[in-house]
């Protein structure tokens, strides 16, 4: 099964479970969790079901396209359901079956791996899902997002697309993976992998990046003061990516690193609080919609 068919299969499976199929969010981020479809929607009491593919940029993992397993940008298939259904593990195993992986014929293990994202003030109880000894999915019950306690708890399922495809297609080099008929990951992404690695480690202007971080930080605070959550959060994401670029280039010392993470966390907490307050002013409208649908 090629990657395109994998994605279509997962979309169909989770769509059948009532998930909204969203498209990737258009601002750089290090993980699918950072999308507003997850970060913001996990806050507050309103129900939410979503599935989407998210390109995830990790500048420090760039290897000029020369490493068979490390990528500047990989892809995650993200599922968020709030509140978490009792049969979520069963639904997940059914999704593997849809991909041609029979849980009865493979060694599938849930290995405890509690999750934390300090820069976003997020934490949760979690498990890595191992398929015949290789991690393919992260399973997390959110306890805290943006420093706020999650009530009700959301469940997040994050499939590593390239990693899962490596298993399904039995390929050792990620660039050999078939994306769709006639196109490999090498065809689609190798040039960008090389160029982003050159930029990250060699040609980026660190003085400009430091200035951008401060500018983005100010703008995030400014928009939150006006109650504009989504523009503010875009700038939080930009701060995070800019920090990752500086960190990957070694431009930030160990002591400075803690301070920068703290500044991003402060922004994320402020966004989370503002989002909750703004939804509360609206009377948490999706709660009313859910109640109406059950009448």
UniProtKB/Swiss-Prot annotation:
Taxonomic superkingdom: Bacteria
Primary enzyme class: ligase
InterPro entries: aa-tRNA-synth_II/BPL/LPL, Gly-tRNA-synth_heterodimer, Gly-tRNA_ligase_asu
EC number(s) given by UniProt: 6.1.1.14
One example of a Gene Ontology biological process annotation: glycyl-tRNA aminoacylation
Database matches in Gene3D superfamilies: Bira Bifunctional Protein, Domain 2 (3.30.930.10), Class II aaRS and biotin synthetases, domain 2 (1.20.58.180)
Single GO MF annotation: catalytic activity, acting on a protein
Key words of the record: Aminoacyl-tRNA synthetase, ATP-binding, Cytoplasm, Ligase, Nucleotide-binding, Protein biosynthesis
Compartments reported by the entry: Cytoplasm
Annotated Gene Ontology cellular component terms: cytosol
Pfam family, any one: tRNA-synt_2e
Catalyzed reaction equations: tRNA(Gly) + glycine + ATP = glycyl-tRNA(Gly) + AMP + diphosphate
Complex and partners: Tetramer of two alpha and two beta subunits.
Protein family per UniProt: Belongs to the class-II aminoacyl-tRNA synthetase family.
Family annotation (HAMAP family): Gly_tRNA_synth_alpha
Protein name: Glycine--tRNA ligase alpha subunit
């Amino acid at each position: 099964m090629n990657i395109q068919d994998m994605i279509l299969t997962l979309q169909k499976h989770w769509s059948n479970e009532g998930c909204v199929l969203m498209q990737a969010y258009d601002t750089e981020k290090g993980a699918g969790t950072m999308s507003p479809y997850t970060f913001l929607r996990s806050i507050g009491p309103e129900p939410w079901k979503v599935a989407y593919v998210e390109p995830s940029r990790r500048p420090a993992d760039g290897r000029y396209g020369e490493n068979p397993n490390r990528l500047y940008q990989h892809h995650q298939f993200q599922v968020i359901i709030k509140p978490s259904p009792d049969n979520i593990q069963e639904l997940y195993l059914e999704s593997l079956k849809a991909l041609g992986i029979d849980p009865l014929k493979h060694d599938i293990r849930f290995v405890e791996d509690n999750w934390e994202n300090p820069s976003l003030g997020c934490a949760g109880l979690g498990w890595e899902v191992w398929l015949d000894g290789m991690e393919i999915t992260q399973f997390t019950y959110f306890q805290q997002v943006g420093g706020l306690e999650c009530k009700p708890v959301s469940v997040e399922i994050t499939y590593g697309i390239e990693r899962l495809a490596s298993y399904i297609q039995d390929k050792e080099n990620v660039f050999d993976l078939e994306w769709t008929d006639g196109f490999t990951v090498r065809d689609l992404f190798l040039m960008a992998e090389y160029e982003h690695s050159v930029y990250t480690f060699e040609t980026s202007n660190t003085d400009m990046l430091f200035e951008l971080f401060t500018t983005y930080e100010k703008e995030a605070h400014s928009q939150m003061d006006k109650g504009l959550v989504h523009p503010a959060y875009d700038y939080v994401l930009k701060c995070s990516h800019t920090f990752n670029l500086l960190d990957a280039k070694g431009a930030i010392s160990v002591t400075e690193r803690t301070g920068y993470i703290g500044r991003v966390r402060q922004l994320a907490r402020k966004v989370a609080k503002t989002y909750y307050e703004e939804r509360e002013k609206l009377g948490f409208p999706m709660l009313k919609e859910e109640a109406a649908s059950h009448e």
